[in-house]
Amino acid sequence: DLVRSRGLGDVYKRQERYLHLLSRGDKIGLTLIRLSIAIVFMWIGLLKFVPYEADSITPFVANSPLMSFFYEHPEDYKQHLTHEGEYKPEARAWQTANNTYGFSNGLGVVEVIIALLVLANPVNRWLGLLGGLMAFTTPLVTLSFLITTPEAWVPALGDAHHGFPYLSGAGRLVLKDTLMLAGAVMIMADSARDILKQRSNESSSTLKTEY
């Protein structure tokens, strides 16, 4: 029994060490969240300058009451859609006339700026806070696509499983933006906490100087 008790005690101590180690991972986790958000916005933002990526967001933009006005002919998008890797000159010409690529380029610039602001947090917390706010706002718009975009749901092509709650591939990608939303809240809170801490330190230094 004594040997068994000692063995259990050793296991308990090892668990304690691992738990203490994991409990200190919040700062590392925040850094990883910040880097992940920056990577996603930077990578996808740069892809917005490539025609296939611009083409892929056409259904979302064309059906969105917040964005469709950026397109010249949003109501005609379905007959001009292409698959990734597919090249159709007539579809490409329509997308050009539709301002698909002009809008996508502008969106790409915004997304790259968000990534840079998020990465700027160690240098300037206010820039990091702004980046977090923009990263938070973006998923609010994209998640609305689940309501406005028919292509977000499995179409009725004969299978019994279609419509709500059966998300299509596009819908499943949009749903993952809930993680972006939560991550943005975390990095905003982290930046705000650091700003308040800096202000507190400055106030303390000022009081010490006065007295």
PLM regions with names:
Residues 1-12:
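Single conserved hydrophobic/aromatic residue that forms the stacking wall/gate
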Residues 10-27, 198-211:
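Membrane-interfacial, low-structure loops and terminal tails that flank and connect transmembrane helices
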Residues 31-49, 97-148, 179-187:
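Functionalized membrane-embedded alpha-helices
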Residues 40-107, 146-154:
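Solvent-exposed, well-ordered loop and adjacent helix/strand elements within mature globular domains
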Residues 163-183:
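Individual transmembrane alpha-helices with interfacial aromatic-anchor signatures
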Residues 172, 181-211:
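Terminal transmembrane helical module of multi-pass membrane proteins
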